[in-house]
Amino acid sequence: MKMIRAVVRPSKAEEVVDALAESGCLALTKMDVIGRGKQKGIKIDQIYYDELPKTMLMLVVEDDTAENVIELITKTAYTGSFGYGKIFVSPVDEAYTVRTRSCGL
């Protein structure tokens, strides 16, 4: 299994969530976050924003679907300008459902 953490622009988050749902990825965690990338913020007119609001989507998928999910997120979240996000992928050894105590997705 893979844990996918996608940090995207808030304006694209619902579009990404909808695209994931249409592809069968219904289970995810969504949270508002603040951060910055390599650009170290952004300057608009005379105001410098050190950190920018983003939305983080976290989901766990089977190994054989991870690449398709990553492609879907990058395609949907793309805006053509800097600061449109980052995707982090990590291995997941086990996942448990609290209610049933069962292991797996």
From Swiss-Prot:
GO terms for molecular function: ATP binding; enzyme regulator activity. Pfam families: P-II. InterPro entries: N-reg_PII, N-reg_PII-like_a/b, N-reg_PII/ATP_PRibTrfase_C, N-reg_PII_CS. The keyword Transcription applies. Keywords: Nitrogen fixation, Transcription, Transcription regulation. One of its GO terms (cellular component) is cytosol. One of its GO terms (biological process) is nitrogen fixation. Gene3D superfamilies: 3.30.70.120. PANTHER family: NITROGEN REGULATORY PROTEIN P-II, PII-LIKE PROTEIN GLNBI. Could be involved in the regulation of nitrogen fixation. Belongs to the P(II) protein family. This is Nitrogen fixation nifHD region glnB-like protein 1.
